Amino acid sequence: MTCADVTDLCTQASQLVQQLRTKDGELGFMSAAVYDTAWVSMVQKTTPEGRQWLLPKCFEYILRTQLEDGSWETYASDVDGILNTAASLLALETHAESRIASTDPPVEEMKERIGRARAALSRQLQAWSVKDTVHVGFEIILPALLRLLREKGHEFEFDGRAELDRLNRIKLSKFRPEYLYSARTTALHSLEAFVGMIDFDKVAHQKVNGSFMFSPSSTAAFLMFSSSWDDECEQYLRLVLQNGAGGGTGGMPSAYPSKYFEVSWVRGQLARLESKLTELQALTTLLDNGYSTGDLGIEDTDSLGEMLRDALVKGGGIVGFAPSIQADADDTAKSLIAVSLLDKPVSAQGLIDAFEGPMHFRTYHGERDPSFTANSNVLLALLNTPDAATVSPQIEKAAAFLCDVWWTADSEIGDKWNLSPYYPSMLMAEAFGKLLQVWSDGGLKSISSQFIRDRVSVCLYQALVRTLQTQNENGSWGSHSHEETAYAILTIAHACQLPVVNQLWTNVQLAVSRGRKFLQNSAGDKAEYLWVEKVTYSSILLSKSYVLAALKVSFERSYPACLANLFIVSKKRVIEFARFHSMLPLFSSMELWKVRAAIVEGYLLLPQLRDRRLAVFSRTGMEEDKYFEYIPFTWTLCNNRRNTFLSTKTLVEMMVISFLNYQADEFMEAVVGRLNSSQRSMTRSCIDEIFRDLKDKPELNDAIQAQSGPRNADANGHRILPQAKRIKMGSQLPSDVSRVLSAFVHHVMDHPSVKAAAPLEYERVKNELQVFLLSHIEQADDNGRFAAQLESTRDDFETARSSFYRWVSSTSSDHTSCPYSFAFYQCLLGFEQASHNAACFQTCEEKYVAEAMCRHLAVMCRMYNDYGSLARDRDEKNLNCVNFPEFAQAGPKSDAVRQKQLFSLAEFERSNMKRGLEVLTEMAAQDRAKMRMLEKVQMFCDVTDVYGQIYALEILRVGCDLAHDCFMLELPAQWSNST
């Protein structure tokens, strides 16, 4: 792997650490923010000479940075530009009303600037998607700005206004001014959001070192709206102007630190203290990724370590981001990690006592939503304690929380404090990599190997593969960002603790080499706006620390036997399965290493499927289920092919429903299909009775709750099915038929996602599932009549109940399980968005087109199936599509002609399926949530298509070994341009 000169890297790292030490600790590395600068520019002070602007350079900065279209810079998110422009428009109006400085622009210029700013803000608000905004506190800050602008004569109406007002009401519903007066809360960081709501004089005592939570905008608001002047606040703002990132040019950061704040994370939002720019983070990043204290300068690291250790001891084992500020788990965890790496460990008991919750660690008291990144840091801190075994329960709790969040995440983990999806992945990979090390060394015997194998390792492997697959052509990641590229390289490095990485080692080396080459060959001094404060900000210091870490981190691999033995993944088997799947049109253009990576992921998930393999259907008397092994591959391949990255929870549930469908098909053919006509009729009545017993959805929910009591799970965390009702159908029907069918139906209908679905969605699953089972009996009846024909007449079906079109569009396609599985899949997708009355498609048009699209998909799959299974069907006397009278004109000895016609019809159905997807895309009208939903629907179509392509190669039913026997099979010539 390409690596920079080690000596040069150590020199750069040492210089970076030296920047953390100044004579008085007053140094800030956070980029200047127009929003805070605008607030400071509005502060007036009464002097003997009259009223004056306190810091006129700040208003000069606002004037200098207004863009041609009237707005101010949007750093990374739409809300950045909105807040910057709104605050600056307010500053323009304030200066226009108070002509107290000769340096302010002429009246006409001010009017022109105000007009352009107003128009720009109106455009920004109209184009803004409120529901897609992640910045914490915007729902309080922006309404306050709009309220102040309304007082200046500016009224703004926009599509997202109702949603913004709704969020504002929710946020303020429990707010009481007394909270700010009596306790030091994070809301003090944004006092400007409470103009007109609080008495500013009553928060004066909350000031620390001349500021309110180290926020220039909050401190400016206090000076503007309190009844008396505060010299300490003035001194603080002047200090920020001179020493902050603006360097005296007028720009003010969103937060400015002091004292050991410089070696702790800069935090502060309306909702919580959260770490952003942090010299502590820079220090721990370097120490944890290949740099020693000697590399960084013993004197510097010792003094920083002592400072942090003293703070922890004085705080009872916990710290906040600055003296006298509320302690939080994130800063505490980072501090514990740092002192441990500096060989000055402090007990983690204070962290546990203060922040441990029932299911995860709280970042601070009163936190509403748990933080993924905070729990990652907590886990890493606990793992770095001298005796990790003593905190094993807490380690498992934090790790389980991270796994649960990753398991249910849609595509990627979002973080409130960093816009890059690679940042949470990096922290999780670092924590899980350390967990594997400590567990392998025998330090965590209470944590089961199953948890390590089935949860931790799957999450870590997915983080690795998804990082590898999203690398840009020039070797970078994200928006061609140095900092994001460093995150990605560090993710890969820590994921190398997994033994299965050996399967991809060449690709890992190549990706890291390309990434490091990008970091070395391109300038990295440009600000990269990734960190979230009131607006997004950048930090050259943090960026450099991550880049230096990525250039030096080790990729050495050593796998103790206890860890390596958890993963039985044959490299030969992976290569053979990858070769086979690469033959299929859907994956023929997919890079071979990506195919292998998906196969390995499938193998990692396979043990969980085996645990549930006998949940419904017994294998007694059945042939070997060779299909079982490759079911996870079809899903992981399609999931990774387009980087869809469906949630792992949904992915696994669809794998389970896939093998249950095969088992149901086997049961209906091997057991029900061999019954006589009278018994099949009784089975039909049995199925009808099972579904009648389900009743309507509301009653069903009550009945299930009464029957099963609390939501039960077995030792593996899987649902325990309620005891299936035994249907009394007489002695002629084998007893296991009603029991097994009832268990299968209840497994599907009792699924939490189905139970939580909207009534229409629930009924659709119910109806499609019933049709699926009944279609097997209809198919068996058709097969029976077909088999009764003389062998000499068996090329054509003489007793067809309908046209070929009607049959293949109903009985035959229902028999594939595609329609009912799609209905079930929609419930899973809907449940990802809402826990009650969830629906994947909302409007009548969407539902209709989606169902029509699925029907074409099912028909296409059935035709592919019959295309490949003609010889088998003939041997087993089963009805095939080409036996319908419509194909008779081809003649009796015309298999090739009939198959060609059938394939042509399958391609017709494919075109209709594609058109359905196109119409759904048009209906989505660029709605982000709907477009994301359609990506998942496309993936379902891909999975179904894969099965059809496998069927067409006559593999699934012939019983050959997919990993070995299929490589001599040839693709249909017609397939060259079909996918």
Swiss-Prot record:
GO MF terms, alphabetically ordered: isomerase activity; magnesium ion binding; terpene synthase activity
Positions annotated to bind Mg(2+) 1: 665, 669
Cofactor(s) needed: Mg(2+)
Family matches, as InterPro entries: Ent-kaurene_synthase_fun, Terpene_synthase-like, Terpenoid_cyclase/PrenylTrfase
Alphabetically ordered keywords of this record: Isomerase, Lyase, Magnesium, Metal-binding
Motif (DXDD B-type cyclization motif): 328-331
Signal found in the keyword field: no
Record carries keyword Magnesium: yes
EC id: 4.2.3.30, 5.5.1.13
Extent of motif VYDTAW motif: 34-39
Pathway named in the protein's UniProt entry: Secondary metabolite biosynthesis; terpenoid biosynthesis
Residues involved in Mg(2+) 2 binding: 665, 669
Function according to Swiss-Prot or TrEMBL: Bifunctional terpene synthase; part of the gene cluster that mediates the biosynthesis of the diterpene ent-pimara-8(14),15-diene (PD). Within the cluster, the HMG-CoA reductase AN1593 functions in the mevalonate pathway, which produces isoprenoid precursors. The geranylgeranyl pyrophosphate (GGPP) synthase AN1592 is needed in the formation of GGPP, the precursor for diterpenes. Lastly, the pimaradiene synthase pbcA performs the 2 cyclization steps that convert GGPP to ent-pimara-8(14),15-diene with ent-copalyl diphosphate as an intermediate.
Annotated domain remarks: The VYDTAW motif is widely conserved among diterpene cyclases in plants and fungi. The DXDD B-type cyclization motif at positions 328-331 is responsible for the formation of ent-CDP.
Name this polypeptide is given: Pimaradiene synthase pbcA
Species this protein is from: Emericella nidulans (strain FGSC A4 / ATCC 38163 / CBS 112.46 / NRRL 194 / M139) (Aspergillus nidulans)
Upper lineage: Eukaryota, Fungi, Dikarya, Ascomycota, Pezizomycotina
